[in-house]
Swiss-Prot record:
The gene is folD. The keyword Ligase does not apply. CDD domains: NAD_bind_m-THF_DH_Cyclohyd. This is Bifunctional protein FolD. GO terms for biological process: L-histidine biosynthetic process; methionine biosynthetic process; purine nucleotide biosynthetic process; tetrahydrofolate interconversion. It catalyses: (6R)-5,10-methylene-5,6,7,8-tetrahydrofolate + NADP(+) = (6R)-5,10-methenyltetrahydrofolate + NADPH; (6R)-5,10-methenyltetrahydrofolate + H2O = (6R)-10-formyltetrahydrofolate + H(+). It holds the Pfam family THF_DHG_CYH_C. GO terms for cellular component: cytosol. Gene3D superfamilies: Leucine Dehydrogenase, chain A, domain 1, NAD(P)-binding Rossmann-like Domain.
């Protein structure tokens, strides 16, 4: 079985991004800039934001983090976003989720300039994706990263049956739309399964490419996968494991040990899709910089 190594590919991408940033610094005197806003003290969000800032520094991008208390009024957050929209040194704006309950996440998404929406969540970017205008939009980072992995590993997709398990706005819906596009790395027949789908296994067993993004540990078992399928595991779930020092370990939405005996190619957890998300966020930020400066 081929292991689709997202960590390895993300490092290759970072080297490519760094080379582009260095070139633009020399030719224009400017570099891309990413600003991340975090509201509250969610530990997982703080770790993720630190990783983004660290990666920006490694490739030479400017990055800043705006930290706000959990009781921040929505109006204050929206005013901050409005200022960043007008800042020519900021090419990407990301508001870390989850947000406190007093803040409307959709209002925040709408407030971000679509040209700086490097998370790809704004309705304008999603609409352009659905209509096939990928050169004029930002694609959500996790689906974008999966497409990059499929391309770099030479996975044949055109005409294949892709089954996406999960319909979130962050992964499931954009992933399905991306795999529908007339692109070399997609062009699939697509089926979406979700919590109300009856007999999910009857669909997943038909998949040439199975993408699991349902948020349930080891949900996809060997009896749900046909031999030779390509399996992409988006899930990150922490389960109890008394054999580890922490007492827990990370697993995906797929039973890796069982399914890997059937799959022709598969992403591990950790080290598969996860590392690609930040890399694609920075690739989107670079694209925003290039569009801004007509490069």
């Amino acid at each position: 079985m081929l292991i689709i190594d997202g960590k390895k590919v993300s490092l290759e991408l970072k080297d490519e991004l760094k080379a582009s940033v260095d070139r633009y610094r020399e030719t224009t005197g400017k570099v891309p800039g990413l600003t991340v806003i975090i509201v509250g003290e969610d530990p997982a969000s703080q770790v993720y934001v630190r990783n983004k800032a660290k990666t920006c520094k490694e490739i030479g991008m400017n990055s800043s983090v705006i930290t706000m208390p959990a009781d921040t009024p929505e109006e204050h957050l929206l005013d901050t976003i409005a200022s960043l929209n007008l800042d020519p040194a900021v090419h990407g704006i990301l508001v870390q989720q989850p947000l406190p309950e007093q803040i409307d996440e959709f209002a925040v998404t709408l407030a971000i300039d679509p040209q700086k929406d490097v998370d790809g969540f704004h309705p304008e970017n999603l609409g352009r994706l659905v209509m096939g205008h990928l050169d004029k939009c930002f694609v959500s980072c996790t689906p974008y990263g999966i497409l990059e992995l499929l391309g770099r590993y030479g996975i044949e997709t055109s005409g294949k049956h892709c089954v996406v398990v999960g319909r979130s706005n962050i992964v499931g819906k954009p992933m399905a739309n991306l795999m529908l596009q007339k692109l070399k790395r997609s062009n699939c027949t697509v089926t979406i399964c979700h919590s109300a789908t009856q007999d999910i296994a009857s669909y997943t067993r038909q998949a040439d490419i199975l993408i699991a993004a349902i948020g349930r540990a080891k949900f996809i078992t060997p009896d749900m996968v046909k031999e030779g399928a390509v399996v992409i595991d988006v899930g990150i779930n922490r389960i109890d494991d008394p054999t580890t020092k922490s007492g827990t370990r990370l697993v995906g939405d797929v039973d890796y040990e069982g399914v890997s005996a059937l799959a022709s190619a598969m992403t591990p957890v950790p080290g598969g899709v996860g590392p690609m998300t930040i890399a694609m966020l920075l690739k989107n930020t670079l694209h925003s910089f290039e569009r801004t400066h007509n490069l």
